[in-house]
């Protein structure tokens, strides 16, 4: 079942066709990657796959909120057949763990890890939530304010509710907020050499 689950993810190639107007705001080098409609009369159509490389760039750059919403929903609800598989995998893992004398599959897997028990992990998550909530709230407020200012400056988006930050809005306005602060990911990456970063991650997760 796990093989079927993973194979469906690898083979998944669904997506959406958008006209160029719907993709207004997309960088040309990103737009050039998208497949074009074969029929001559439809050459203004581009195909955005539900995979991360395509969906993230549409969510991050497309000015049209309807475009971002369609991309978000399509990507979020891809592979519906995997839902039942995942439920069955979780069910069987739990049953196997119980047969081995563990309370759950999580308890079985954690026995050889640094975090020995589910209770330890839960406590850690709660501490992280408390520590990060204020910062996360402030960042969300900043993104919401960026949406308001953007809508005020762009009168063609009059149908948008400036007081609502939808899930498909976050990447777009977060990008604008970072650009306002002149955050360049390429410059940030200079502080994280590949070899050192990979070794640190492996040590953390081992």
Residue ranges and their predicted role:
Residues 67-68, 72-82, 86-89:
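Catalytic nucleotidyl-transfer cores of nucleotide-processing enzymes
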Residues 58-74, 112:
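Short, charge-rich amphipathic alpha-helices with coiled-coil/heptad character
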Residues 3-51, 59-60, 87, 92, ...:
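Active-site-proximal, well-structured secondary-structure segments within enzyme catalytic domains
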